[in-house]
UniProtKB/Swiss-Prot annotation:
The gene is mch. This is Methenyltetrahydromethanopterin cyclohydrolase. Pathway: One-carbon metabolism; formaldehyde degradation; formate from formaldehyde (H(4)MPT route): step 3/5. GO terms for cellular component: cytoplasm. It is an enzyme of class 3 (hydrolase).
């Protein structure tokens, strides 16, 4: 999550800048860091980030702002739905992590999902993109380890194991955020 109080800027970010900045606990937990003078970030937000946000992102990445490439797209645009769909493998990896499967035992992975049609309402657009991943996404992880560990992952990974499976994401979001 990217926020800036003065301007009220709020957005979600994905891309290699996350690993370079290491602001998320996950990267510390995994003891993973990237290094380099350049990076990129895709922002899911309704407007371009202000200069202060760009400078702050570059600072956290330890790079000159000129080495930072930022793309942004609204959730309700075609570009937004495409970049959200591109996260389907990340969703599978997050679930594997939540299941306490050793991420170093995931050798490779591939995933596909339908691209949700754009919709002009933020909550409905977010719902459609997440529903596409939850109900239409398919991930294939190549793992090493014991048969029992692989079986536990295979049985726990599908979204159908979630108690709210079958409920549209927009309804789940409304229930949580009122």
């Amino acid at each position: 999550t990217i926020t800036e109080e003065t301007t009220g800027f709020f957005a979600l970010g994905s891309g290699p800048a996350r690993a370079l900045s290491r602001v998320e606990d996950l990267f510390k937990e995994l003891n993973y860091a990237d290094q380099g003078p350049n990076t990129a970030l895709v922002i899911e937000g309704d407007k371009a980030p202000p200069a202060a946000v760009i400078e702050n992102i570059a600072k956290h990445c330890g790079i000159n702002p000129k080495g930072l490439s930022i793309l942004y797209a609204t959730t309700w645009s075609l570009a937004g739905t495409v970049q959200i769909a591109a996260r389907v493998l990340e969703v599978a990896m997050h679930k594997a992590h939540a299941l306490h499967f050793a991420l170093e035992n995931i050798i490779d992975g591939t995933a596909t999902t339908p691209i949700a049609p754009p919709f002009p309402d933020f909550v409905k657009a977010m719902g459609r993109t997440n529903d596409a991943i939850i109900y239409g996404g398919r991930a294939h992880l190549f793992v090493k380890g014991t048969d029992a560990e692989a079986k536990r992952l295979a049985e726990g990974l599908p979204s159908s194991t979630c108690a709210s499976f079958g409920k549209p994401f927009a309804e789940i979001f409304a229930d949580v955020n009122g």
